[in-house]
Regions:
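Conserved alpha-helix/loop element of class I SAM-dependent methyltransferases that forms part
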Residues: 3, 7, 32, 37-40, ...
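Alpha-helix N-capping/helix-start residues
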Residues: 13-14, 54, 100
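Alpha-helix boundary/capping detector
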Residues: 27, 32, 46-47, 86-87, ...
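Short secondary-structure transition/capping segments
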Residues: 27, 41, 106-108
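Short hydrophobic/aromatic-rich motifs at helix boundaries and adjacent loops
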Residues: 29-34, 76-80
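Conserved nucleotide-cofactor-binding alpha/beta core module
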Residues: 65-124
Length: 124
């Protein structure tokens, strides 16, 4: 994924590439769509929400350039994958999701990925 999809889109930051390498995207993809975990498509996650394409997630993470001493507010937890990438950077992440079903599945995936430097809230 990194060599064929991410680098060609100008994502070259070593911290971003390390995060993408370390955080298993497939953990955050619903079981029925795991075969598409690394495809350049939006993946439905329920509640009429989708995961972004991997290249867009990578470009967003590179543009944000999170630092270890930052506190980050993420509005819209979704699958939890971006939450995990932000947390991997060492930042303290607070994530808020309106849909209880999504916060529940994201919490499971984040726990499975051993991501702990975050707080999750359900709300609008």
């Amino acid at each position: 994924m990194i060599e064929q999809q991410i680098r060609p889109w100008g994502v070259l930051d070593s911290d971003v590439l390390a995060a993408l390498q370390s955080v298993g995207r497939e953990t955050f993809v619903p079981p029925d769509y795991r075969h598409l975990a690394f495809a350049d498509v939006e993946i439905p996650i329920g509640q009429a929400q989708t995961m972004m394409e991997p290249k867009l997630e990578a470009r967003l993470l590179q543009a944000l350039a999170p630092k270890t001493d930052e506190n980050i507010l993420e509005v819209g937890t979704g699958s939890g994958y971006m939450t995990a990438l932000l947390s991997h950077a060492g930042a303290n992440v607070t994530t808020v999701e309106i849909f209880p079903e999504l916060i529940s599945s994201a919490a499971e995936a984040l726990a499975a990925a051993s991501i702990s430097n975050l707080s999750m809230e359900q709300g609008d």
